[in-house]
Amino acid sequence: MRLIERGSGTPRVAIVGGIHGDEPAGERIVERLLEELTVEDGVDEGTVQLVVANEPALAVGERFTETDLNRTFPGDVESDTYETALAARLTTVLEGADAILALHTSHSAPPPFAIYTHLSDTVRKTVTGMPVDYVVDVSSLRPTTLDSTLPNTISLETGRQGSEDAVEFGVEAARAFLRTHGILQDEEPTFTEKTVVSVEEEVPKGEGTPEVYYRNFEEIPKGEVFARDDVYTHRAPRDGLVPVLASEHGYEDIFGLYGRVAGTMEPEHS
């Protein structure tokens, strides 16, 4: 793990890239921010922690070395499994931060979107300050991710894995995050309403050639095929479902998630 701090005092916010080694955009976004936020200049107020999390996995371009880092929080510092011990170290570094942004990419088609588990005032502020239209509530899923473990944390899917667009958008979004929390004061932050999608269940994947027929947040009519392979043919079991993280090759065991539009998230004091 690599940690670089800029600025001093409060608030203290963190931007974390490289949780998965096959998502190099996060590391590149952190490197771009380091170029802009020099020791002498760049931070107007407070402290920003810039973290590259899983350096060994990034070095070999694999999602993880032993186990998925984002499935093992809060971790165990005594563990012999690399990512499990790393999760505990990362948790210690970030504990007490006023706001945390975790950067990710996926094999899904755009648009980028935010993810949260626990809706606090800080999470609302962060999300409504992001340049995205959608935010996904994953509170019904596993409690072993960074955003489910540390308060005031959101994850951000910046775009398609391996694309330059994901890097450029991630830098833009990271700047927006820093403006939202007063670290950057070069311009006023912008807060906008977001569409909230609540995740309901994972959609399993089997063997054979996978096919996905709907993009993220595109409503699937009841009974229509969302995805199939040699084992499964998934038809939407009820009305109102939309895919989240839908892809043919993004995950070994799922096509993505079924979600449902649950309303909107308004900026504070709107």
Question: Which residues make up each language-model segment?
Answer:
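Structured catalytic-domain cores with a bias toward divalent-metal coordination
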Residues: 1-270
